[in-house]
Amino acid sequence: MTQYNVTGMSCAACVARVEKAVSKIDGVNSCSVSLLTNSMNVDGSADSSAIIKAVQNAGYGASLKGKEKKSADVEDSLKDTETPKIRKRLIASLIVLAVLMYFSMGHMMCGLPLPSFFDNNHIAMGLVQLILSGIVMVINQKFFVSGFKGIIRLAPNMDTLVALGSGTAFVYSTIALFMMTDAQVRGDLAAVMSYMHEFYFESAAMILALITVGKMLEAHSKGKTTDALKGLMKLAPKTATIVVDGAEKTVPIEQVKKGDIFAVRPGESIPVDGVVIDGESAVNESALTGESVPVDKLIGDTVSAATINQSGYIRCEATRIGEDTTLSQIIKMVSDASATKAPIAKIADRVSGVFVPAVITIAVITAIVWLLLGQSVGFSLARAISVLVISCPCALGLATPVAIMVGNGVGAKNGILFKNAVSLETAGRIDTVVLDKTGTVTKGEPAVTDIVTVENISETELLKTAVALEKSSEHPLAKAIVVYANDRHIIGDAVTEFNAVTGNGLTAKIGSESVYGGNYRYISQFAEILSDEKAKAEQLAEEGKTPLYFCKGNKFLGIIAVADIIKEDGKQAVNELKNMGVRVVMLTGDNEKTAKAVAKNADIDEVVAGVLPDGKEKNVKELKKYGKVAMVVDCINDEPALTSADLGIAIGAGTDVAIDAADVVLVKSRLADVPATIRLGRATLRNIHENLFWAFIYNVIGIPLAMGAFINLFGWQLNPMFGAAAMSLSSFCVVTNALRLNFVKVHSSKHDRKIKHKNKKENKTMEKTMKIEGMMCPHCEATVKKTLESIDGVESAEVSHEKGSAVLTMSKNVEDSVLKKAVEDAGYKVN
């Protein structure tokens, strides 16, 4: 995808013209132009010079953006250079317009005195209005230059409508002035007064002034849509304190190199990404993650640019600088996403391509019809001019991109990063969320959940023995016990003769006494385990936990249960999704017992266990038949499933936000950010619908009103000046409505509503993979296949004796024990 800057566009018709011109070039696969960011994305092998030439031939300017878009370049592109220019034009226009209105209407409506020179000097009055309105037109010559260029190139735009409306009023008034001069020479005072009433000089000037008012309001509001992005850029520190030969010195941020040591005092911003090498502190990372609670940082922990050091003094080694920092990557992602086009924008694009020519045609027909009905030339032209100036393709062109821009900004402030506009729109349509278990629903690291001691043995004594034994082990379950004990300041005794017995447990000596830890089969060899303790252990296992038994000598001490526990916000997030009408499914490669236990704790109703990575992809594709599916994972191991879903969400990215396979990147490891993503997507989609409705309904009502269609029914007719005022406000209203997205609370479920789906056949199919030993030939495959497919709930079985596996497609959940028994009864072994 190659990006270009495009200049000279004023409305949606310009966008359609540029896209049409570029799409005709050989080698261009797709072209997307954004009116809001004045940018163009082109996919294909076409030469950039050919693309730039095509844009120029269409009447616009184009230049190639740098391959590596620097944050400084993005910041420059977001600077509001348009509003100050428009403001100057507007002030000059209003000053001249005030004088014009004084001469044309002030003396009649307000009784303001005119210089005696103008008494009965109608020609002088007309000439003054001609000159003053001409000055306003010169001040706003941009409309005429752009508008008439569009006509010459057969690509009329919004400026064309304004130029035709104002120009027609001016030309007609000038002709009326000449006719009045002739009448005055002939002494026909009645004709003089009649022609005086045909002057529309003030309308010609007022149209330009009011359109300029609207353009300024629009430019100001458009600037507000990028506030979130600008806010991120302002966070980037300009200087850093680096340590050289033990001395600290402040340098510009550009001089910091990878590997430099930098110091950060309390209250200062961290200048670049790095790792703490000295000291400890609490860092506020809300700028990047939206999380206001400070995060403790110790030696070895990573820190990110633009986060705030709140307490201690720390020294860090720079690991990412310049455009590689997390902040710069986030800025680039938000900027790139805002420059892309959502599929829903195609509605406006199709209309915009024919909108301006259609309006010009309607205006001409309007004038002709009123003339044929016997109305005066002035009346007929007034109706045609009203049609020209009230029609607004700008609102259509801005309806989608402004909402996308604001939505992306809101997401960035909350640690939700969308790769493009398509991702944001798709998030609003999601009705099924597939969750990976490990690291997504659960924390991804084992933790102690239960401690069961025998009579006369305290928890402290059990933990002391357990930690003494486990601290020498590298097993994840051992680490969980050590962390648990350390948190409670329990230190185990030193051990000797430590030995890890593969598949069973651990053994060592404390002093002269042997201690053991491991599974039931191993520990029961050394100590008697009562039935009550064994029953408790089995109950813990049913809950998806791993019971570890410990004994000292031949005395059984107790059980410590360890499990990968669900995240604190896991249950709440799942319930929020359900309340939003979203179907939640958990896919995991773990065994069914563990998966069901985790799902029960997280309130997840649908579970598919024992699924290999390629099986996850198949399940996701199956679910896509029934709706829009989002796949949520915490790592790239599930990339096939991530890319096969309608929306791939990577959770807990931290500083690695540039994950190619994901459509949405969640910086924090919070499951609550998943419903927040969908909530934001829905709010943005709803806002786009509102904008498109307003843009369409405005023209649907406004154009017939301007034509005079309601004059005979209600006596309603629209003065061209009021038409210009309405046009100037239409785009402003669309942009202002988009700004309301800034008030969306993405983590609040207060206003959640269940989405209404079309009646769909409920999808109950799931896949499961079994490992089977003993199959030697196709005959064995057929036997196993027939056996499995005879089980109620198994729709089909793909069996391979070469792979030693069977992939089952099931219409309902079937217990592993049932499947295992059937296969083993047929003479084969299930692993």
Question: Which stretches of residues belong to each language-model region?
Answer:
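P-type ATPase nucleotide-binding
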Residues: 448, 452-580, 592, 604-620
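Transmembrane helix-loop-helix hairpins at the membrane interface
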Residues: 85-239, 350, 451, 715-720, ...
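Conserved ATP-binding TGD loop and adjacent catalytic N/P-domain core of P-type ATPases
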Residues: 16, 29, 266, 430, ...
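Conserved catalytic phosphorylation-site environment of P-type ATPases
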Residues: 288, 347, 382, 395-469, ...
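Flexible metal-binding regulatory segments at protein termini and peripheral loops
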Residues: 1-124, 149, 247-250, 332-340, ...
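Juxtamembrane coupling segments of multi-pass membrane pumps/enzymes
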Residues: 2, 74, 183, 189-191, ...
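Membrane-embedded alpha-helical bundles of multi-pass transporters
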Residues: 109-123, 152, 156, 171, ...
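Conserved cytosolic catalytic loops of P-type ATPases
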Residues: 26-49, 53, 198-199, 230-324, ...
